[in-house]
Regions:
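An anionic, turn-rich surface loop/hairpin at beta-sheet edges
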Residues: 103-104
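Active-site proximal loop and beta-alpha junction motif in alpha/beta enzyme cores
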Residues: 1-100, 109-168
Length: 168
């Protein structure tokens, strides 16, 4: 297993809503980093069995929601037990669902921790691509300042940079 630290959450809005097809959804917003990667966290009851075409339409609509000037990755989630969440991510740029999204998973757990719905300690998040465990550590003021993902990883490609003029 590997453990990585994500950027700190910034620009949090926990009590937002978004409307699509005449339905109002709870919709938290968080960016990881400053400026950061934008995520909308949207609870969906029965997410595992939710109609795939309907979820895709909703993801496309919320991804471009006017309250998100950068657009947003849309992280649909359902709490399925104590410190256990199921999540699906509609990813901006890909413009479809992906098997997993580490920053999205961290964003969902940040939101749920701050709302008091999970402990923030070793929260299990199941996704199509597998399972991650998230730790959202809070400072004395209650702000999430350290966000960690733990899970397996696989090498999917290797490369070599050969341009000696490349400056990093």
């Amino acid at each position: 297993l590997y453990r990585i630290r994500l950027n700190d959450p910034w620009h949090l809005r926990l009590d937002g809503t978004a409307e699509a097809d005449g339905i109002t959804y709870d919709c938290a917003y968080v960016e990881l980093g400053d400026p950061g990667i934008p995520h909308a966290a949207v609870p969906i009851a029965g997410l595992r069995d939710y109609d795939a075409a309907a979820l895709l339409r909703l993801g496309r609509t919320l991804r471009h929601y006017p309250d998100f000037p950068k657009g947003a990755n849309v992280n649909f989630y359902e709490i399925i037990g104590p410190d256990h969440v199921y999540e699906r991510t509609y990813e901006r740029g890909v413009e479809d669902f992906t098997y997993a999204c580490g920053t999205g998973t961290g964003s969902v757990v940040t939101v749920l921790t701050l709302l008091g719905k999970v402990s923030g300690k070793h929260v299990r998040v199941d996704m199509t691509g597998g399972t991650l465990y998230v730790d959202a550590e809070r400072n004395a003021a209650g702000r999430v300042t350290d966000l960690y993902l733990t899970g397996p990883t696989n090498v999917v490609c290797k490369g070599e940079i050969t341009d000696e003029n490349l400056v990093l």
